């Protein structure tokens, strides 16, 4: 899901709200991410639900992507109130969750937007190794944006519930209230 206008035309930027994605089977090859919000998030993105989805393959990318579920904020939009529920992951070779605010080649707005109130519930990894998960905010000499209020409830790897950040292989930087 993207939220940007035509190149160089900010008058076409629109908010993305009240999107319900459900009962999907997803296969992701290199490059990219299976369920992705971003890059190009220049407006407000909120009240999204991803529910009852099966990610059957998410290939190793070796760069910035390769996640089963990602939010990549490279612009100034505010991403909030997003729910991921009842998602089964059969194969995630690189990352399970990848949530970050960053400056990259896709950036069109200098000021960075926020990511907050993101909820993961009943996410199951069914096969393979436990992939790493990343949550990272943004810091420059003039700006700091922290990712905050991210919840994980009932995340399991091959039937074993993740009780700690270590179980989830979660790495955080510039993030609060995880």
PLM feature spans:
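Extracellular/periplasmic carbohydrate-active domains that bind, remodel
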Residues: 1-178
């Amino acid at each position: 899901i993207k939220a940007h206008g035509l190149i160089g035309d900010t008058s076409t930027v629109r908010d993305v709200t009240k999107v319900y994605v459900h009962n999907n089977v997803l296969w992701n090859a290199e490059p990219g991410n299976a369920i992705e919000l971003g890059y190009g998030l220049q407006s407000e993105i909120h009240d999204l639900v991803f529910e009852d989805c099966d990610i059957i393959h998410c290939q190793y990318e070796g760069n910035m992507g390769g996640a089963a579920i990602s939010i990549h904020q490279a612009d100034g939009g505010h991403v909030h109130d997003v729910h991921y529920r009842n998602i089964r992951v059969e194969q995630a070779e690189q990352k399970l969750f990848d949530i970050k605010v960053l400056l990259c080649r896709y950036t069109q707005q200098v000021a960075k937007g926020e990511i907050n109130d993101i909820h993961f519930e009943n996410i199951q990894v069914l096969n393979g190794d436990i992939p790493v998960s990343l949550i990272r905010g943004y810091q420059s000499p003039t700006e700091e944006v922290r990712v905050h209020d991210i919840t994980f409830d009932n995340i399991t790897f091959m039937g074993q519930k993740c009780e700690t950040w270590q179980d989830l292989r979660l790495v955080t930087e510039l993030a609060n209230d995880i």
